């Protein structure tokens, strides 16, 4: 699987030597942009989960479609967060020259992973509870639609 990701990175022209990170200022800039991208990835994942939940149709009779929505909601959250972490680990970490800076960035990458995971699940749960309570997105919690 790792060879496939490296092949994709080569195809889209991402090189390990692009923009080497050698100074503390460059590292702080990279960390700040990583935090911003983590928030953006979280927002995009919530939007994709909303779209996917609206694509799954209601079922007649004993409606169990909320289970499909819940499974996709969890899959989208895990794929978005782990994908973001793997991308940073394969693309940004090799650009950092100093080993100490690499450890500092790895810690930032781990915190951003938790930000995406916790932010995705917490914000989407709040949206389900308060804004989309009777919609398909809110049915992920197991609530039935009004009949």
Predicted features and spans:
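Transmembrane alpha-helical segments of multi-pass membrane proteins
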Residues: 65-83, 108
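N-terminal signal-anchor transmembrane alpha-helix
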Residues: 1-50
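Canonical alpha-helical transmembrane segments of integral membrane proteins
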Residues: 40-51, 75-87
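Interfacial non-cytosolic loop connecting adjacent transmembrane helices
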Residues: 16-32, 83-110
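Alpha-helical membrane-embedded segments
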Residues: 106-128
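Membrane-helix boundary/interface segments in integral membrane proteins
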Residues: 28, 45-72
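Membrane-water interface at transmembrane helix exits
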Residues: 49, 53-57, 88, 92, ...
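Cytosolic juxtamembrane helix at the C-terminal end of the final transmembrane segment
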Residues: 121-147
